[in-house]
Amino acid sequence: MTASEPTREARLAALRSIGHVPVLIVGGGINGMGTFRDLSLQGVDCILAEQGDFCSGASRAPSRMIHGGLKYLETGEFRLVRESAAERNRLLCNAAHYVSPLEMIIPIHSWFGGVVPALRKFLRRPAKITERGALVIKLGLWLYDLYGALNRVMPRHRMIARQDILREIPDLDPSLKIAASYYDAWITSPERLVVELALDGMAANPGNIALNHLRFNRVTGNQVELQDVESGEVFSLT
């Protein structure tokens, strides 16, 4: 916290003087805080309330991978893949101090395995895919590269010959036929990124407030009740 950043006490004092706010965001994870920052940059007045620490729930718990939705290609959700890959690329560009490329290696044990089940699943027919051969994986990664082309900052996928991948990673099963390499991303500190989003939002629109340990209690008519977890103080907004 620098001298120019509002303390929690200062933000609570500002909240006491607010009777009405157009937008109330409940939850201070990556989605809530990203919304707070976006609205602040657009000049929309808003308040964000998080009952615990920022980024203390689902945003902190996962593998910390930032993926572009590769698995959704099999179910034909191309729009979701395009959006996820674009957001991944934006994070790589805008938050490179926290988000880095991560190479993924896929050992492949057949050439044509899974072609028919993959086609049925793509057509939304019942299918169980037990194996994905080189052809299915090659096609999937080609599409993944295509949908992640906007603002690309990572290499495209590549297929790696058996002898080359075993030389590079000798502990792999030597019965593999070929391997594939593609890139997604991972984040080192999602908590720090969420805090940066909060500070960006409050700097862009100084009237906006992001507060942790502020619980959403209830809605009564057109009134919303918030409560400071630490002191028990209650705030009413319309």
What does each model-identified segment do?
Residues 1-23, 38-42:
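Extreme N-terminal leader/targeting segments of oxidoreductases
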Residues 36, 40-41, 200-202:
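Gly/Ala-rich phosphate-binding loop of Rossmann-like dinucleotide-binding domains
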Residues 32-33:
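N-terminal Rossmann-fold NAD(P) dinucleotide-binding loop
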Residues 180-238:
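Helical element adjacent to the flavin cofactor pocket in flavoenzyme catalytic cores
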Residues 24-26, 238:
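Short hydrophobic core segments
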